[in-house]
Each structure stands twice: as C-alpha cells, then as structure tokens.
A protein has these predicted regions:
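Transmembrane beta-barrel architecture of outer membranes
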Residues: 52-54, 102, 159, 219
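Cleavable N-terminal export/targeting peptides
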Residues: 1-33
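Transmembrane beta-strand segments that form the barrel wall of outer-membrane beta-barrel proteins
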Residues: 35-50, 66-74
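Short sequence motifs at beta-strands and strand-loop junctions characteristic
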Residues: 35, 46-49, 95-100, 150-157, ...
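Outer-membrane beta-barrel pore domains and translocons
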Residues: 46-48, 72-74, 125-129, 165, ...
Length: 228
C-alpha cells in the first residue's frame, strides 16, 4: 500500500514533465506506425543561374532527424557573386563549357515535433562542385585556333544552413527556404586572357595560374518538392 501511495504522489508531483514525455512518445510511436510523408524529392531551380542543376532526396529517419542528399550537373555560371567566390563564365564563342557532376549530403534536424518533415530546422551539409571549361586561344588577328587551355574550379564546402520547410495543407507539394554560411575550400586553375600591346604587333596572351585557398561563402535559396 505504501509503494502504491508513493507512485501516485510521484505522478501528481511532476504533471508537466509526464505530459511532455508522453507527447514525445506518442509522436515517436506514430512516426513508426502512421502512414505519413517520410520521403521528399526536391529541385532548386534558382541554382541554374549559378551554373548548377541539382535534384535532392530527403529521407526522414525519425520525427526530427532526416538525411538529405543531392546530385546534379554543373554548366555555365551566369553570376559573379563575390560572397561565394564564383566567377561568371565568358559568353564568347571561344568558351566551351564541360559539364561536371556535383553532389552534396547532410543531416537535418527539425526543431519541432511533427510526424512529417516540416518546420524550422538546422542542417550541416558537405558539398562538392566542379566547374570546367576549355578556352580556345586566339591567333595574331584575333581568330580562334584549335589550341585550348583548361580552366577548372573545384569547391568543397561544409555548409551550416537554417531554414523552414512547409508541406501544403491539402497536398504533398512543399517549399523549403534556407540560408546560412559555409566554409569553402577552393582549388582553382584560372585562365586569364589579355591583349599584349608591348611588342611590335599586338597579340593575345594567356596566363594560367593555380591557387588553393579557403574562404567563407553565403547561401540563400528556395527549393520546391513533393513528399510521399
């Protein structure tokens, strides 16, 4: 009888704590049993202007933790953004863009208890980008020759992102807005073209420089997707 009394008193002494634990237990149990969105396919159309076309897959591991991975292709970079260390690609006929694969993977933690992957979150991600192009050299009169120089930019990022993902109220379509800083390791083989006027006849000259450094980049974007 005394043991039963102690149990009853302990239950009434911590009503708030018991309620929180039971709520989290119910959410965790429902995540494993209820038919809800646990997979998401997403696109990031605005990254096209930065020379990347990726597709993302997010898989909910628990009601708060998920894994997001993406694979894509790098093409022409249209934007020169100083805060990301990018250079815009030349639109001239002598620039040949060479597509390369890009990939990223990371873990996402949602700050709220929800059966489905939505709400405010924090995410840490590793990303690899490679932009490659061949620059055709010009002859004495400015005509393009068959000789080329390879321009190559390789970026390895560790990104710390914060965002908000929301499923539609009447459908499984969603949006995901995010932003945050990244530590970027860069290895660049950069081709620079200029007209040399020091000789008797003007001619095109080329400098190829290799650099390896680290910088801080910043990201802000919007993904759209579908959950199932």
């Amino acid at each position: 009888a005394s043991a039963l009394s102690l149990f009853v008193l302990a239950s009434f002494a911590q009503p708030g704590k018991t309620k929180v634990v039971l709520y989290k237990d119910r959410v965790a149990a429902a995540f494993d049993t209820v038919d809800c969105v646990k997979n998401v396919i997403k696109a990031n159309p605005l990254l096209f202007f930065r020379g990347e076309i990726p597709i993302y897959y997010e898989r909910a591991i628990t009601h708060r933790l998920s894994l997001e991975a993406g694979v894509g292709v790098t093409l022409r970079n249209y934007l020169a953004l100083s805060f990301t260390g990018d250079d815009a690609d030349d639109f001239g006929a002598g620039t040949e863009i060479i597509p390369r694969l890009s990939f990223n993977a990371g873990f996402r933690y949602y700050f709220v208890d929800d059966l489905e992957p939505q709400g405010a979150y924090g995410q840490i991600t590793f990303a690899h980008l490679n932009y490659t192009k061949d620059i055709r050299m010009k002859g004495p009169t400015g005509e393009l020759t068959d000789q080329t120089l390879r321009d190559d930019r390789t970026y390895n990022d560790v990104r710390l992102l914060f965002g908000y993902q929301m499923l539609g109220s009447s459908s499984n379509w969603l949006f995901d807005v995010y932003g945050g800083p990244a530590f970027r390791d860069r290895f660049n083989v950069k081709v620079e073209e200029h007209l040399d006027l020091t000789g008797e006849r003007p001619q095109w000259a080329y400098n190829v420089t290799e650099t390896k450094d680290q910088t801080v980049a910043f990201f802000l974007g919007l993904k759209v997707g579908y959950g199932f």
